UniProtKB/Swiss-Prot annotation:
One of its GO terms (molecular function) is glutamate-tRNA ligase activity. A motif ('HIGH' region) lies at residues 13-23. This is Glutamate--tRNA ligase. It comes from the Bacteria. Catalyzes the attachment of glutamate to tRNA(Glu) in a two-step reaction: glutamate is first activated by ATP to form Glu-AMP and then transferred to the acceptor end of tRNA(Glu). GO terms for biological process: glutamyl-tRNA aminoacylation. InterPro entries: aa-tRNA-synth_I_cd-bd, aa-tRNA-synth_I_codon-bd_sub2, aa-tRNA-synth_I_CS, aa_tRNA-synth_I_cd-bd_sf, Glu-tRNA-ligase_bac/mito, Glu/Gln-tRNA-synth, Glu/Gln-tRNA-synth_Ib_cat-dom, GluQ/Sye. Its main location: cytoplasm. It catalyses: tRNA(Glu) + L-glutamate + ATP = L-glutamyl-tRNA(Glu) + AMP + diphosphate. It comes from Shewanella denitrificans (strain OS217 / ATCC BAA-1090 / DSM 15013).
C-alpha cells in the first residue's frame, strides 16, 4: 500500500508590482489548502521577466505575506536562480524529441499569422521546423515543445468542473527564447514537478495555460497536480477591480489602518463560504476550507464590508495585540507614546468608535500631546462664563485627590454637579472640552484617568484662563 502524497501548494507571484488583493486572496486560498490538509506551503518568485521584475516588488510581496501571517514552509525560491535546472530539462527533451529548435524568423511568423487571419484560421505556429533534421548553424533559434497533434487534454478543475481542450487548438509552445531564457510556462512546470506541488490554486487568467502545462508534465513523466482556477475580483460597479475600487497593495491596507485579521477574513469570504458564517478566525478557516466550496462567479469588492470587519476585530481582539499594530500608526503620525497611557488602554477606551487604526491613532493624540487650541465650535458652545464655576470647583476637588482612579474621578464629577445644583452635562461638557480640546471622547472619568492627574489639572487651568479672558474681553 502506497502512502498518499502530502498536500503541497504554492503561491508563485511575479515581482513586477505590489501584492494586490487578488494575489493576496490566491495566496490565502493556497495557504489554507495546505494548512487544512496538514500539508506544506511553498513561496516561489517567478522572476523570469527580467526586464520588469524588481527587488522592490519582491520586498513588497514578502512584506505583504509576512504582515498577513501567511507563513511558508519552503522558499522563497527564485526562478532566475534555477536556470541551470531548466536548461538541463530542455536538453533532455531535445534528446528525446519532445522539443525542437525553431529557426523561423519574426518576419515569417508575422506573415504566417496574417495569412491565417485572412483565411479565418486560428493563429498558431504551423510546425514549420517541427521535423527538421539537426543542423549546424549560427542562426538564432527558439526551442519549442512538441505538443501532441491528436487527442485532447482533460482535467477536473475544483472551481469550474471538467475541462477538455483539443490538442488541435494548441500550438508548439516556445519554452526557451532566442536569448536562452526559459519561458514562464515551462519554468512553472519544472518547478511544480521538482517541488512536489499537488494542488495549484491560481487566477482564472491562467486557465488557458493549464492544458499546455499538463502536456509538458506528461512529456516529462511528471505527476499532474489538481487545479483550482479562482474567478476575478470586480469593483462594486461590476467593472474590473482598479485603484478607484481599492485595488492597492496589501501594505497600503496596513498603512490605512486595517488589521491583517480583517483583510484575511474579508478575502476568504470574497469567493468562498461556509453556510451563513461571516466572521472567521484563522483556525476556523483552516477547519472549514475546501477548494470545492470556492464560488465560480466573480466577486465584487465592497470597502464598507471590509471596514465593518475591521471595526469588529479592533473591538474584539486582545487589546495588547491590537496595540502592537497601533504602535506603527502612532509612530507614523509622529505621536510620542512615551509620556502617556499604555496603548492597550487606549485601544480599550477608543475601540468602540474607531473604524481603522489610523483613525484610532489620530483620535488618541490628546492623551499624549498637549493641544494648542480648543476646538472653536466646542469652545464657543461650552467654554462660556457659566463654565467658570464648575471648572474651578472640579479642579479644586481633583487637586485634593490622593487616589487617581476612574471611580474616584467619577465621584468628583458627580459631587461637583450636586454641590452646584446643576445637571451632569453642565459640568461634563466644559470639562471634556477642557481636557481633550474637543467635544467627543470616551467616558469622561476614564478620559481623565488616562490623561493623568497633572496633565488634567494643567488643561483645566488653561480652560479656566480661556473662559476668564473671554469674560473680560
Amino acid at each position: 500500500m502506497t502512502t498518499p502524497a502530502i498536500t503541497k501548494t504554492r503561491f508563485a507571484p511575479s515581482p513586477t508590482g505590489f501584492l494586490h488583493v487578488g494575489g493576496a486572496r490566491t495566496a490565502l486560498y493556497s495557504w489554507l489548502q495546505a494548512r487544512a490538509n496538514n500539508g506544506e506551503f511553498v513561496l516561489r518568485i517567478e522572476d523570469t521577466d527580467i526586464e520588469r521584475s524588481t527587488q522592490a516588488a519582491c520586498d513588497a510581496i514578502l512584506d505583504g505575506m509576512n504582515w498577513l501571517g501567511l507563513t511558508w514552509d519552503e522558499g522563497p525560491y527564485y526562478q532566475t536562480k534555477r536556470f541551470d535546472r531548466y536548461h538541463e530539462i530542455i536538453g533532455q527533451m531535445l534528446e528525446k524529441g519532445t522539443a525542437y529548435k525553431c529557426y523561423c524568423s519574426r518576419e515569417r511568423i508575422e506573415t504566417m499569422r496574417e495569412e491565417q487571419a485572412a483565411a479565418g484560421l486560428q493563429q498558431k505556429y504551423d510546425g514549420h521546423c517541427r521535423n527538421l533534421a539537426a543542423r549546424e548553424t549560427n542562426e538564432p533559434f527558439v526551442i519549442r515543445f512538441k505538443n501532441p497533434l491528436e487527442g485532447s487534454v482533460v482535467f477536473d478543475d475544483h472551481v469550474r468542473g471538467r475541462i477538455e481542450i483539443s490538442n488541435e487548438m494548441l500550438d508548439d509552445l516556445i519554452i526557451q527564447r532566442t536569448d536562452g531564457v526559459p519561458t514562464y510556462n515551462f519554468c512553472v512546470v519544472v518547478d511544480d514537478w521538482d517541488m512536489g506541488i499537488t494542488s495549484v490554486v491560481r487566477g482564472e487568467d491562467h486557465i488557458n495555460n493549464t492544458p499546455r502545462q499538463i502536456n509538458i508534465l506528461k512529456a516529462l513523466g511528471a505527476p499532474i497536480p489538481e487545479y483550482a482556477h479562482v474567478s476575478m475580483i470586480l469593483g462594486d460597479d461590476g467593472a474590473k477591480l482598479s485603484k478607484r475600487h481599492g485595488a492597492v497593495g496589501v501594505m497600503q491596507y496596513r498603512d490605512d489602518g486595517y488589521l491583517p485579521e480583517a483583510l484575511l477574513n474579508y478575502l476568504v469570504r470574497l469567493g468562498w463560504s461556509h453556510g451563513d458564517q461571516e466572521i472567521f478566525s484563522m483556525e476556523e478557516m483552516k477547519q472549514h476550507f475546501k477548494l470545492g466550496d470556492i464560488n465560480k462567479a466573480a466577486s465584487a469588492f465592497n470597502t464598507d464590508k471590509l471596514i465593518w470587519l475591521n471595526q469588529h476585530y479592533i473591538k474584539t481582539l486582545d487589546p495588547e495585540y491590537v496595540a502592537s499594530h497601533l504602535a506603527w500608526h502612532m509612530e507614523d503620525q509622529n505621536i510620542d507614546t512615551s509620556n502617556g497611557p499604555a496603548l492597550a488602554e487606549i485601544v480599550t477606551a477608543l475601540s468602540e468608535r474607531a473604524k481603522t487604526l489610523k483613525e484610532l491613532a489620530e483620535s488618541s493624540r490628546y492623551f499624549f500631546e498637549d493641544f494648542t487650541d480648543f476646538d472653536e465650535v466646542q469652545a464657543k458652545k461650552h467654554l462660556r462664563g457659566v463654565a467658570l464655576e464648575p471648572l474651578t470647583l472640579v479642579k479644586t476637588k481633583l487637586a485634593a485627590l490622593t487616589e487617581w482612579s476612574v471611580s474616584v474621578i467619577h465621584q468628583v464629577i458627580e459631587d461637583t454637579a450636586t454641590e452646584l445644583e446643576v445637571g451632569m452635562g453642565k459640568v461634563g461638557m466644559p470639562l471634556r472640552v477642557a481636557v481633550t480640546g474637543a467635544g467627543q471622547s470616551p467616558a469622561l472619568d476614564l478620559t481623565l484617568f488616562l490623561i493623568g492627574k497633572d496633565r488634567s489639572e494643567q488643561r483645566i487651568s488653561k480652560a479656566i484662563d480661556f473662559v476668564a479672558d473671554r469674560i473680560n474681553s
